[in-house]
Design a protein with these regions (language model features):
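An N-terminal hydrophobic leader/cap segment in hydrolases
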Residues: 1-25
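Membrane-embedded segments
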Residues: 27-104, 108, 113
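Short alpha-helix in the alpha/beta-hydrolase fold that links the catalytic acid
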Residues: 63, 171, 180, 194-203
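Primarily recognizes the serine-hydrolase "nucleophile elbow" in alpha/beta-hydrolase
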Residues: 104-108, 112-158
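Short beta-strand/loop motif that positions the catalytic acidic residue
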Residues: 178-179, 184-190
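Acidic catalytic loop of the alpha/beta-hydrolase fold
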Residues: 189-193, 219-221
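Catalytic histidine neighborhood in serine/cysteine hydrolases
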Residues: 199-220
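Post-His helix in hydrolase/transferase enzymes
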Residues: 222-236
Length: 239
């Protein structure tokens, strides 16, 4: 119900960013696929991108092609069970996958103060979990939810989802534990995660915090000039 690794909404975009395919080892001995775009580790921050609950890395090419135009390095990791990776996706397993990506980039020579965690939809749950009580440069949350139980209630209002759903991703309980600057992005037209959830996450977040809220964006936000401009402003504020 929650994880859809085989969903394909790949639009056919060609990857214009120069990337290195890397293998990221987890503590339970899985090797996960990652794409790494290195521009300048000393001059620029490094984004670790945690994607949502559906599709492959190719589904994010349109975003990566825009990120490459910013003064930033980035690593996007594919979850276990996604993009040909072995393993079963669960809440705790994806937390381990995310931490493995952080370990990989730190072993590559990037310190916490130069790492920006970027969560997309489900990935906001991993970014929020990992950012707690740490000193990362920043956190970006695109279409965040308050908890997976809250999000599921929209689609299953007559089912006791709190009892049935094992993976709860309780972002709202963790957001206060994040000390890093936060950018929350959400569109009012989101048909999957209600816009009010993004507003609530922003309200509960500590300062410094920034928002990019739009009228017309659905769940997967348009990576247009306005959004890229907001990302650029946020990244520059971290220097």
């Amino acid at each position: 119900m929650l994880y859809h690794p085989n969903e394909n909404n790949y639009s056919g975009n060609n990857l214009s960013a120069e990337i290195q395919k890397v293998k990221i080892k987890t503590s339970d001995n899985l090797e996960l696929l990652g794409w790494f775009h290195e521009k300048d580790l000393e001059k620029f921050k490094t984004i670790i991108f945690f994607h949502g609950n559906a599709g492959t890395l190719e589904n994010r090419i349109y975003k990566l092609n825009r990120l490459k135009d910013l003064d930033v390095n980035f690593l996007i990791i594919a979850w276990r069970g996604f993009s040909g990776n072995q393993g079963k996706p669960t809440e705790n397993n994806l937390y381990e996958d995310g931490r493995s990506a952080v370990r990989w980039i730190k072993n590559y020579g990037v310190e916490d103060e130069n790492i920006v965690l970027y969560g997309e939809s489900l990935g906001t749950g991993i970014a929020t979990e990992i950012a707690q009580n740490n000193n990362f440069a920043g956190v970006i949350l695109e279409t965040p939810f308050t908890s997976m139980v809250d999000a599921a209630k929209k689609f299953y209002p007559y089912i006791p989802v709190k009892l049935l759903l094992r993976d709860k991703y309780e972002n709202i309980k963790k957001i206060k534990n994040i000390r890093s600057p936060i950018l929350v992005m959400h569109g009012e037209a989101d048909q999957i995660v209600p816009f009010a959830m993004g507003q609530k996450i922003f309200q509960e977040a500590n300062n410094p915090k920034f928002s990019y809220f739009t009228k017309n964006d659905d769940h997967m936000m348009e990576f247009d000039e306005k959004l890229i401009g907001q990302l650029n402003l946020f990244l520059k504020s971290l220097n």
